[in-house]
Amino acid sequence: QIAEKTDEKCMSIVDCICEDKYCFSNEKIFGMVVPTYFWRLPRIVAEYLGKLRIENCGYTFFLTSYGATTGEAGSMAKKIMAHNGQNFDAYYSVIMPDTWTPVFDLTNKNRVDKWLSDGKKQLKLVIGNIMSKRKGNFVDRKLYSRKPEL
């Protein structure tokens, strides 16, 4: 949805790794959208960020999706980028249903629909911020209530 609204292309990290594509330059907008995995970045994302080079891009952002909390995903991305002398212009988060089923019950359709609805609202705000090139850290680290009002 972000690529569609910003008229940009969408690439997977796996494809970038397979194509040995770690440098992005002169892009109008460069963003990464990744899941939070056990309150952290997935290892493949952390390793990719360690090799990533962003040069002369108009606006850069990092977005993490999360179930219960973003944990340290945003701060990990920021720390890895800083280690390489780089930074994203903005950091965002969007709620999604947590899929770790031993703990989170996904059988309640109303609850899942509520999480998806909240996520769509957050994504709409994020897209607006991206379009206006808003800078800052907008990652929500609060523990999301698993019992939303229905």
Annotate each PLM feature.
Residues 2-20, 24-34, 38-150:
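FMN-binding flavodoxin-like domain, especially the glycine-rich phosphate-binding loop
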